[in-house]
A protein has these predicted regions:
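Positively charged n-region of N-terminal signal peptides that target proteins for export
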Residues: 1-5, 20
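Cationic-aromatic interfacial patches
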Residues: 22-163
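Well-ordered beta-sheet/strand-loop patches within structured domains
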Residues: 21-64, 129, 136-137, 156, ...
Length: 544
């Protein structure tokens, strides 16, 4: 055997003594010996393959009596080539093909083509184990995510996916059925948006490979409106329309306006056609930037539990400032509304729960953190603050306390043993209705009296809860299966001034997501600002 070929595939110098025995043993015996001895550790060192799926390898091979899966009569099976191609394709899952030993697989395949490798059972055993390790590692990362979500410091609290798949059994079935490619794709998340995003990533890799180097970054200096002349328009036109058009290249005309509007809509900006700092920032996004962004969001989808995919569920995308009530795997939208989410320092957490009831004309018991951090200083400055905001001070047993009887000069954030509660009504910070899905964060969806904030592009203003733009319409949709609660009765309850709770006949799954990129069924891409700066940490974990 040519030593150069050994270097390309596996260094066998540490196991020369075992090779002499391999002629007398079958491949199955060699696989068993390797798995039951220290030889796998030697192989890890020599081949630079980290056999992280050892437990699954044992299960897989023991059930098939340690028979080889990827070679036949001394040659590689066609499914080995399919696996190599699937590993290469993992690039478009936002993964790194080298993590699944693409280089080693390529070398093995090349060496089988150059020279007969089937004369050595030990060598065939090692080849088989490397292919199985590659498959199982890729399968588990596609199914659960490459990075354990608990290792990410950002506030991701969605219930981890329950592993129901027996990877070794899927591999066995795929080997028998010559369906390796189909089985790998079967590990993708159930959400149809995943495949859509994946194709977008493929497109951005093509853009990155064809992009001219050193593309200048656009520098914002002043607002540019339709009809304005500006040197920056030359570069913007080149990027969005292309060169060679016989027009006044510095004039912001209607043809360019159409393209600018597309960019603004794609990035979730106000589509007013005015080229300002946010639009310039969007235009400066490179294909490389988008590749990282897409990879991060594909990983987020892999983290989601399958239980999120229900007949109907409520989805809030924090980064998109939008709530959607959907069915049919998210393809059919029953209701949509703008939302306001938490400020950066009081960010809305990512989690899932079940909506179980609605409260009309709610009171608001102010969280202690807000009382201490914001209200006490305001009350000290303005004795009328509480009455003007329809608030009362209560003991924890529910007894009302006269604020005039408190010695406010001695009250501090550390010694305020009371609750502050706001009465129902249009003045209430929760508005006229709240939607409850019990959770440890005390986060819920609610109305708000501050309607003007929904006109903003960036809507991160709350203390963590989710404010809804169209609460009455949402209540109607949620209660449409309850004949006792029609539009008129809902309106009456919202304006009654009396707190009224209504239990839902069936709990509705709620998932609070954070996606900064997605692709719809028509292939349109949507990009959103990373308002909580959460993408970078996941990107580092994926590509470190």
């Amino acid at each position: 055997m040519n030593k150069i070929i050994f270097v390309l595939v596996i260094s066998f110098f540490s196991i020369l003594s075992l090779q002499a025995q391999s002629k007398e043993l079958g491949v199955a015996s060699e696989i068993r010996n390797i798995l039951e001895s220290s030889s796998l550790g030697e192989l890890s060192h020599d081949s630079k393959v980290n056999f992280s799926q050892y437990d699954l390898l044992i299960k897989f091979y023991s059930k098939r009596e340690f028979k080889e899966a990827w070679t036949k009569e001394g040659g590689l099976s066609s499914q080995a080539l399919v696996l190599r191609d699937q590993v290469r394709e993992s690039l478009y899952d936002g993964l790194v093909p080298e993590d699944y030993y693409l280089g080693q697989l390529d070398d093995i395949i090349m060496n089988f083509e150059i020279e007969k490798m089937g004369e050595n059972a030990l060598q065939l055993a090692y080849v088989d184990l490397i292919f199985s390790e590659s498959y199982l590692k890729l399968a588990t990362d596609l199914y659960k995510g490459k990075t354990p979500q608990e290792a990410i410091k950002t506030n991701w609290q969605i219930q981890a996916k329950t592993v129901k798949v027996k990877f070794e059994e899927v591999l066995e079935s795929a080997v028998k059925g010559d369906s390796i490619g189909q089985s790998i794709r079967g590990f993708w998340p159930e959400y149809k948006v995943y495949a859509n995003i994946r194709e977008s990533l493929r497109d951005y890799y093509k853009m990155a490979s064809s992009q001219e180097e050193n593309t200048p970054e656009l520098e914002y200096k002043k607002l540019i409106k339709l009809g304005d002349r500006n040197r920056l328009i030359v570069e913007i036109r080149s990027r969005l329309i292309g060169e060679g058009s016989e027009v006044d290249s510095e004039l912001y005309d209607s043809a360019l306006l159409k393209e600018v509007l597309k960019v603004q809509k794609r990035f979730g900006l106000n589509p007013d056609g005015v080229i300002g700092p946010a639009t310039i920032s969007a235009l400066n996004e490179t294909p490389e930037d988008m590749i990282l962004r897409i990879a991060v969001n594909l990983e987020r989808l892999r983290w989601l539990p399958d239980t999120v995919v229900e007949d109907k569920f409520i989805m809030v995308n924090i980064a998109n400032y939008q709530l959607d009530y959907v069915q049919d795997n998210g393809l059919d939208t029953l209701f949509s509304s703008k939302v306001i989410v938490g400020k950066q320092y009081r960010s809305t957490p990512v989690f899932n729960g079940e909506m179980s009831y609605i409260v009309f004309s709610p009171t608001w018991t102010v969280p202690l953190s807000i009382v201490r951090g914001e209200m006490i200083p305001k009350i000290k400055r303005d004795p009328s603050y509480l009455s003007r905001n329809h608030m009362k001070i209560l003991t924890y047993s529910g007894k009302e306390v006269d604020p005039a009887g408190l010695e406010w000069s001695t009250v501090s954030v550390k010694n305020f043993p009371y609750m502050v509660r706001q009465s129902p009504g249009p003045h209430n910070s929760l508005g006229l209705v709240k939607f409850i899905f019990p959770n440890k964060f005390n986060v819920y969806i609610h109305d708000t009296p501050s309607k003007s904030l929904f006109d903003k592009d960036i809507r991160a203003f709350s203390h963590g809860c989710i404010r809804l733009h169209k609460p009455a319409e949402f209540a109607e949709v949620i209660l449409q299966d309850n004949a006792l609660w029609d539009k008129e009765k809902i309106y009456e309850a919202m304006h009654s001034g009396k707190e009224t709770a209504v239990m839902l006949k069936k709990k509705i799954p709620v998932v609070i997501l954070y996606l900064t990129f997605w692709t719809d069924t028509g292939g349109k891409n949507y990009i959103r600002k990373d308002i909580y700066n959460r993408d970078e940490e996941i990107a580092r974990a994926l590509f470190q």
